[in-house]
């Protein structure tokens, strides 16, 4: 079993929609970026393949790509998480699944499988966090967006750099990963304020030098 707080140190999230490249197949580009990120030291990867320019309407191709990403993560002993798609996560033996407040409940996910899935839950308010804190099924909390972000078509209001500090002062003890518009210059402040780590998408997927981007975020 993975150490959850260590796992959250640098949490990379991506799908084909995040890896544009006019000269290559997006799936191959994702695999290339993921391997470079793994080599550079990311501590977790979440496969989040949805919306425009993704393989969402090609489930067989999406599943095949998810398996390739899982296998890469296994080579580097890095947890492989699937966003939202609980059935896929269970079918391909992912290490975990991440869901939002309006997705399948962590309680139901635990009832679906005997596998020790890591379960992450997205949060935007203190009320969300308190519900997560009290659910034994939730292993870690995603908290954000810290800043406005273009990676999601619809997102909650930004919470800022200091919100995680308020959460810790209010008594939230579960592992927290901060997400949403996070850049290298924000990492130290977020961790000082109580985040266990940061989650990023384009800070890595669109970086001109993936290895350097990862090292700056660690």
From Swiss-Prot:
It holds the Pfam family TMP-TENI. It comes from the Bacteria. SUPFAM superfamilies: Thiamin phosphate synthase. InterPro entries: Aldolase_TIM, ThiamineP_synth_sf, ThiamineP_synth_TenI, TMP_synthase. 4-amino-2-methyl-5-(diphosphooxymethyl)pyrimidine binds at residues 46-50, 83, 122, 152. Binds 1 Mg(2+) ion per subunit. Its cofactor is Mg(2+). Keywords: Magnesium, Metal-binding, Thiamine biosynthesis, Transferase. It catalyses: 2-[(2R,5Z)-2-carboxy-4-methylthiazol-5(2H)-ylidene]ethyl phosphate + 4-amino-2-methyl-5-(diphosphooxymethyl)pyrimidine + 2 H(+) = thiamine phosphate + CO2 + diphosphate; 2-(2-carboxy-4-methylthiazol-5-yl)ethyl phosphate + 4-amino-2-methyl-5-(diphosphooxymethyl)pyrimidine + 2 H(+) = thiamine phosphate + CO2 + diphosphate; 4-methyl-5-(2-phosphooxyethyl)-thiazole + 4-amino-2-methyl-5-(diphosphooxymethyl)pyrimidine + H(+) = thiamine phosphate + diphosphate. 2-[(2R,5Z)-2-carboxy-4-methylthiazol-5(2H)-ylidene]ethyl phosphate binds at residues 149-151, 181, 201-202. One of its GO terms (biological process) is thiamine diphosphate biosynthetic process. PANTHER family: THIAMINE-PHOSPHATE PYROPHOSPHORYLASE, THIAMINE-PHOSPHATE SYNTHASE. This is Thiamine-phosphate synthase. It comes from Actinobacillus pleuropneumoniae serotype 7 (strain AP76).
């Amino acid at each position: 079993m993975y150490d959850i707080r260590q796992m959250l140190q640098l949490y990379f999230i991506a799908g084909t929609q995040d890896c544009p490249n006019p000269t290559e197949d997006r799936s191959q580009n994702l695999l290339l970026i993921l391997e470079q990120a793994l080599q550079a030291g990311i501590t977790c990867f979440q496969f989040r393949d949805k919306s425009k320019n993704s393989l969402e309407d090609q489930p067989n191709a999406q599943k095949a790509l998810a398996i390739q990403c899982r296998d890469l993560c296994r080579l580097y002993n890095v947890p492989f998480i699937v966003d939202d798609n609980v059935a896929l996560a269970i079918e391909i033996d992912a290490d975990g699944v991440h869901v939002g407040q309006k997705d399948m409940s962590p309680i139901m996910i635990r009832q679906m499988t005997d596998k020790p899935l890591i379960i992450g839950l997205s949060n935007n308010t203190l009320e969300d966090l308190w519900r997560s804190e009290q659910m034994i099924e939730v292993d870690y909390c995603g908290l954000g967006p810290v800043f406005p972000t273009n990676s999601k078509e619809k997102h909650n209001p930004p919470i800022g750099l200091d919100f995680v500090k308020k959460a810790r002062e209010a008594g939230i003890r579960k592992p927290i990963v901060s997400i949403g518009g996070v850049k290298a210059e924000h990492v130290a402040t977020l961790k000082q304020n109580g985040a266990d780590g940061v989650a990023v998408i384009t800070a890595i997927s669109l970086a001109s030098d993936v290895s350097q981007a990862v090292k700056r975020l660690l």
